[in-house]
Amino acid sequence: MHKVTKFAIRHLSDKASRFVPKAGVYPKGYAVGGIHCGVKKDGKSLDLAILQNTFGKNASAAGVFTVNKFKAAPVQVSKKILKEKSGSGINSFVINSGNANAVTGAQGMKDAEDMVLVTDSVLENPTNSSLVMSTGVIGNNLPIDKILGGIPKLASQHLGNTHQHWIDCATAICTTDTFPKLVTKRFSIGDDTYTLAGLCKGAGMICPNMATLLGFFVTDAPVTPSALQQILKYAVDRSFNSITVDGDMSTNDTIVAMANGAAGGEVIDNTSSCAERYSRLQAEIVDFAQQLAQLVVRDGEGATKFITIRVKDALSYKDAKSIASSIANSSLFKTAMYGKDANWGRILCAIGYADVTSANSVIPEKTSVKFVPVDGSEHLNLLVNGEPEQVDEERASEILQNEDLIVEINLGTNGGQSADFWTCDLSHEYVTINGDYRS
């Protein structure tokens, strides 16, 4: 019986504990776990994780990575392995937290490669069958001896497929997170039933492009590497690329997926003959990725609000997303939300400088803005067809007292395209957390 280690993370507040599942459904053919190996200095917090395909057949894998020019060593190593293997035969992920192994020169590259080498050896994988990820402080070399010594211990004693194993794994990738982020779901495609499990970390340095944070999806569905890559990229664009906490893009952002086919059924590919099954899987993964991405925003450093920016009736999806992103990243808007101030001028300002595709993408005389409560109560119009409304400040205050809020913008272009973007407010606590990050 492999051991489980009760997760060591900051004491969960009542707010945080709401988002940690008490149970889950998990895909067939995987073993996961996490331990403390010594990267984190407190002597107990979990800081090393492994996800392993145990099905006995090579899995398909896909990845989406940061476009930050200072790509961390593990990002470079994982991208290279994924490309060389064409997404086939990747059977494990190994992750450390507490140190990003970013901007660490030749030694950092060697350390990332050694993590892959040792993981493949102890799991009896062929060479370059593992992807490696790191997260934490930038600019310091890894305590690599502790990590390389921890990998065999984790692999031999602490991997399994119970709920606690998954919680340990999700906790071991955390840094400033206040809770481990884990989501599972079961779904059917035709007569076949499949399961998805996903975990991610992130609370600050969140403003992605191509991917964000660290995130892992695993499924027992049979999917070709090329189909998995296309689905992952599509899903990430509509989830992890549609969130922001503070406008900073990490050097280490990585989202990876693995599909081992352990549940059987017809292989899902991206050919026309498989279009229906492909579309069904894509829809499930998009919904799943959005659930995980939203947990990151809910755990935004110092955040007190979860805000959905919903842009409707844009000329294109690109315009809708760009405008939503512009609002979501506005520090003035985010601080107004923290202060419960219905300052809609900051919303219009962010709409006005958004990077859109044409002069007709935003027409002030057709633009409307409103606050939409999530409890189903009456919305509050702020701007209607370019004309300001007399705002009921008491009603605005009632709405802004809530943790969740939708800000809806209708561009009135008759283009019919829409996009959602998720963000949080910006508080005094955010400054405190990041001012003390290395201390």
From Swiss-Prot:
Statement: the UniProt record of this protein carries the keyword Mitochondrion: yes
Enzyme Commission number(s) of this protein: 2.3.1.35, 2.3.1.1
SUPFAM superfamilies reported in the protein's UniProt record: DmpA/ArgJ-like
Compartment(s) of residence: Mitochondrion matrix
Molecular function terms, GO-annotated: glutamate N-acetyltransferase activity; L-glutamate N-acetyltransferase activity
Keyword Signal carried by entry: no
Major subcellular site: mitochondrion
Pathway membership: Amino-acid biosynthesis; L-arginine biosynthesis; L-ornithine and N-acetyl-L-glutamate from L-glutamate and N(2)-acetyl-L-ornithine (cyclic): step 1/1; Amino-acid biosynthesis; L-arginine biosynthesis; N(2)-acetyl-L-ornithine from L-glutamate: step 1/4
Site (Cleavage): A211, T212
Note: This protein may be expected to contain an N-terminal transit peptide but none has been predicted.
Protein's job: Catalyzes two activities which are involved in the cyclic version of arginine biosynthesis: the synthesis of acetylglutamate from glutamate and acetyl-CoA, and of ornithine by transacetylation between acetylornithine and glutamate.
PANTHER family: ARGININE BIOSYNTHESIS BIFUNCTIONAL PROTEIN ARGJ, ARGININE BIOSYNTHESIS BIFUNCTIONAL PROTEIN ARGJ, MITOCHONDRIAL
Descriptive protein name: Arginine biosynthesis bifunctional protein ArgJ, mitochondrial
The organism of origin for this protein: Candida albicans (strain WO-1) (Yeast)
